[in-house]
């Protein structure tokens, strides 16, 4: 004679349930259950049941539990030889920390304190920036029950979503960053520039600027001075006309157009010159010339000592 004891589940409460709370499973022949398996293979063995009888199991929901099906097993998952019967219970909702709506941090700057209000924020283990960096945070709950987490926006924060993460690893968005960048930047002077000139760049949130990259140069230079409204930087000799880039620690850059001085030819002093002789050129900004290229490809390097006149040797 053989017989079976039909294991059955009648109710599972509470649902939704918060990690750390006690889940009560009621049914028949639950005394045969050796393991309660939460979604994605997260088992709790009968030794860890809070209560266990024919009609009821009480089990603490693991902090790592996620929303999904719960499975009851009449043998342990550690028993590789056992032929397990599995009873699936669909639709357990595991509570996550939540906010009513993600904050808009568009106007925020590195160093600003960010306060996030929400529910079940005590579950938060990690606050992560858009670039993947984890930041320290403080959790608080007021006497009226208001929950908050507070953190400081780091220097290298980038645009994107800030998320909070509980033990389950599920990421929940709490804020979106559109970093407060320097905008409407004006360069003074913006034209007629030469190496060694001091350029004043005026705008908003200029204290965010860490370096300046000039057109024609790979290596960035540091500002000579900066404040919330302006940055002062010395024009390198090798810089050319184009867009200089104001760089921030977050990796973002803002372009500003500049124009350098150009040498201007006006006249030759001597109309006829013999090979190997000297020729004198008159013009403007001639001290900017470093090399003269003749028809045919011959080159002569020069060291001007005047802005209006340049004497060079004709090639032989």
Place the predicted regions along the sequence by residue.
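Ser/Thr/Pro-rich low-complexity tracts
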Residues: 1-316
């Amino acid at each position: 004679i053989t017989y079976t004891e039909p294991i059955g589940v009648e109710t599972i409460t509470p649902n939704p349930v918060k990690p750390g709370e006690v889940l009560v499973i009621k049914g028949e022949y639950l005394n045969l259950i050796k393991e309660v398996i939460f979604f994605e293979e997260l088992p709790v063995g009968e030794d860890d049941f809070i209560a266990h009888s024919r009609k009821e199991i009480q089990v603490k929901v693991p902090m790592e539990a996620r929303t999904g099906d719960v499975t009851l097993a009449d043998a342990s998952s550690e028993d590789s030889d056992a032929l397990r019967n599995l009873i699936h219970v669909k639709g357990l909702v595991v509570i996550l920390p939540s906010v009513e709506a993600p904050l808009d941090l568009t106007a925020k700057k590195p160093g600003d304190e960010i306060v996030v209000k929400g529910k079940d924020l005590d579950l938060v283990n990690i606050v992560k920036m858009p670039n993947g960096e984890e930041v320290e945070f403080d959790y608080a709950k007021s006497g009226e029950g208001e929950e908050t987490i507070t953190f400081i926006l780091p220097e290298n924060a980038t645009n994107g979503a800030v998320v909070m993460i509980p033990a389950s690893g599920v990421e929940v968005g709490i804020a979106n960053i559109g970093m407060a960048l320097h905008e409407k930047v004006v360069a003074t002077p913006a034209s007629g520039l030469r190496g060694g000139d001091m350029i004043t760049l005026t705008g908003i949130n200029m204290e965010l600027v860490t370096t300046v990259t000039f057109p024609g140069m790979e290596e960035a230079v540091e500002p000579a001075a900066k404040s919330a409204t302006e940055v002062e930087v010395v024009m390198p000799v090798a810089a050319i006309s184009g867009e200089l880039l104001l760089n921030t620690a977050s990796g973002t850059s803002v372009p500003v157009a500049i124009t350098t001085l150009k040498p201007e030819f006006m006249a030759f002093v001597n109309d006829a010159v013999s090979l190997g002789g000297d020729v004198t050129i008159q013009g403007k900004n001639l001290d900017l010339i470093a090399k003269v290229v003749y028809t045919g490809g011959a080159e002569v390097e020069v060291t001007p000592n005047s802005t209006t006149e340049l004497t060079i040797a004709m090639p032989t």
